[in-house]
């Protein structure tokens, strides 16, 4: 008989919740994590008494009451509403695209005026079968919004021209003919008071966790310890890249502590101009309505994934989707491995 019933590779949301629930049911679990902390990409680090989202902004939102009630047992949430702002040159626009955006863009006041303006721009281009992301976006919202708020940001995000990206990446663009600038439609939304890390500490209380462990460096040993494995890493890496490597994008974060109480007046400002190298600036104190004397900002840069980088999201194109399907078929045939999480499924 093996020492553990479950070996859980990765202490992010999927791995931590699995470990918590399995332990509640009397199963013996070992959680291993390659980083020096739990929490995955939701990890928050306290800097200058501000909870800094180390791996980019994470706003908890759901319309599922069961999920909302479940997460409440680990933290109290505030009422934060995600209302990002887009900066193009010296202009600021409300996101998602709504009447505030259209008023700033064209000076229109009523929903009818805004709808007519967008329809006019779409019909002017006469795109019936979009061949790429650029044509798809223009066919949905017109050229003005595309040029100012979509093009530069998207090209930085993917590292490719919009004319080289497939149309299916954008199936729809949310357009609201109201003055509601709440980014999410979900019923429940907020930020855990005190940061996300406490959630994981409470989830993993009493469970054996080992940090700074590379599963692949000692794979045979760790696989021998448990009856079943829960794997939350890169699915292609698990299978030894036997069909080839999936392509990912990575991110770089540059933090600055500033001796001012308020830098940009909003938690998230997207920079949509191509010549600005970063995609957005996060000012973390605004997630929890902070009043500290200083502030912490993070500039977020999108970059090509290189070995040793953290993979954040897979490149969504035909080649990668076909490759993923092959790995998914392999995963589905594993009887003693559960794949989950952002990269595992």
Model-derived features: where do they sit?
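Short FAD-binding loop at a beta-strand-to-alpha-helix junction that anchors the flavin cofactor
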Residues: 331-345
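Short, well-ordered alpha-helix to beta-strand connector turns
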Residues: 4, 26, 207, 225-227, ...
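Beta1/beta-strand and adjacent pyrophosphate-binding region of the FAD-binding site
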Residues: 2-14, 30
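Active-site/ligand-binding neighborhood in enzyme catalytic cores
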Residues: 89-96, 100-228, 232, 239
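Dinucleotide-binding Rossmann-like beta1-alpha1 core, especially the glycine-rich loop
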Residues: 48-123
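Glycine-rich FAD pyrophosphate-binding loop
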Residues: 20-48
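Mid-domain catalytic core of redox enzymes
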Residues: 25, 215-326, 330
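Short loop/edge segments at beta-strand edges and connector loops
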Residues: 10, 81, 209-215, 341
């Amino acid at each position: 008989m093996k020492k553990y019933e479950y070996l859980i590779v990765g202490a992010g949301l999927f791995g931590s919740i699995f470990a918590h629930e399995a332990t509640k049911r009397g199963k013996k679990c070992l959680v291993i994590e390659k980083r020096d902390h739990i929490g995955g990409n939701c990890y928050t680090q306290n800097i200058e008494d501000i909870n800094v989202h180390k791996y980019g902004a994470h706003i908890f939102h759901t319309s599922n009451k069961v999920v909302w009630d479940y997460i409440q047992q680990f933290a109290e949430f505030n009422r934060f509403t995600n209302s990002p702002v887009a900066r193009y040159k010296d202009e600021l626009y409300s996101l998602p695209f709504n009447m505030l955006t259209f008023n700033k863009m064209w000076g229109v006041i009523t929903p009818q005026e805004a709808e007519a303006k967008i329809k006019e721009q779409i019909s002017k281009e006469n795109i019936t079968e979009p061949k790429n992301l650029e044509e798809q976006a223009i066919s949905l919202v017109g050229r003005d919004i595309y040029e100012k708020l979509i093009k530069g940001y998207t090209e930085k995000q993917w590292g490719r021209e919009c004319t080289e990206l497939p149309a299916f990446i954008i199936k729809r663009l949310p357009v609201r003919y109201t003055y509601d600038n709440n980014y999410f439609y979900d019923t429940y939304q907020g930020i855990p008071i005190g940061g996300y890390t406490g959630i994981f500490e409470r989830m993993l209380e009493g469970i054996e966790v080992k940090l700074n462990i590379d599963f692949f460096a000692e794979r045979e040993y760790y696989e021998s310890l448990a009856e079943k494995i829960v794997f939350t890493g890169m699915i292609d890496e698990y299978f030894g890249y036997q069909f080839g490597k999936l392509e990912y994008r990575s991110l770089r974060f540059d933090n600055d502590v500033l001796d001012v109480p308020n830098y940009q007046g909003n938690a998230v400002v997207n920079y949509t101009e191509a010549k600005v190298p970063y995609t957005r600036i996060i000012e973390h104190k605004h997630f929890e309505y902070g009043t500290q004397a200083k502030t912490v900002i993070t500039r977020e840069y999108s970059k090509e994934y290189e070995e040793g980088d953290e993979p954040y999201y897979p490149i969504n194109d035909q080649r990668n989707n076909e490759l993923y399907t092959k790995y998914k078929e392999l995963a589905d045939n594993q009887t003693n491995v559960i794949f989950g999480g952002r990269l595992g499924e």
